[in-house]
């Protein structure tokens, strides 16, 4: 069960960084 928590934390951190970059810089890929 500990592995699931670590995976959840990793995905959450990646999503936060991804959205932070997206909101800071508008996406120019495929648009």
Swiss-Prot record:
Q: Which UniProt keywords apply?
A: Chloroplast, Membrane, Photosynthesis, Photosystem II, Plastid, Thylakoid, Transmembrane, Transmembrane helix
Query: What's the protein's topology in the membrane?
Result: Single-pass membrane protein
Q: Name one GO biological process term.
A: photosynthesis
Segments passing through the bilayer: 3-23
Task: Kindly indicate whether the keyword Iron-sulfur belongs to this entry.
Answer: no
Q: Where in the cell is it found?
A: Plastid, Chloroplast thylakoid membrane
Q: Which GO terms describe its cellular component?
A: chloroplast thylakoid membrane; photosystem II reaction center
Highest taxon above the source species? Eukaryota
Q: SUPFAM superfamilies, alphabetically?
A: Photosystem II reaction center protein T, PsbT (SSF161029)
Function text: Found at the monomer-monomer interface of the photosystem II (PS II) dimer, plays a role in assembly and dimerization of PSII. PSII is a light-driven water plastoquinone oxidoreductase, using light energy to abstract electrons from H(2)O, generating a proton gradient subsequently used for ATP formation.
The entry describes its oligomerization and partners as:
PSII is composed of 1 copy each of membrane proteins PsbA, PsbB, PsbC, PsbD, PsbE, PsbF, PsbH, PsbI, PsbJ, PsbK, PsbL, PsbM, PsbT, PsbX, PsbY, PsbZ, Psb30/Ycf12, at least 3 peripheral proteins of the oxygen-evolving complex and a large number of cofactors. It forms dimeric complexes.
Family of this protein: Belongs to the PsbT family.
| Alphabetical list of HAMAP family matching this protein | PSII_PsbT
Q: What is this protein called?
A: Photosystem II reaction center protein T
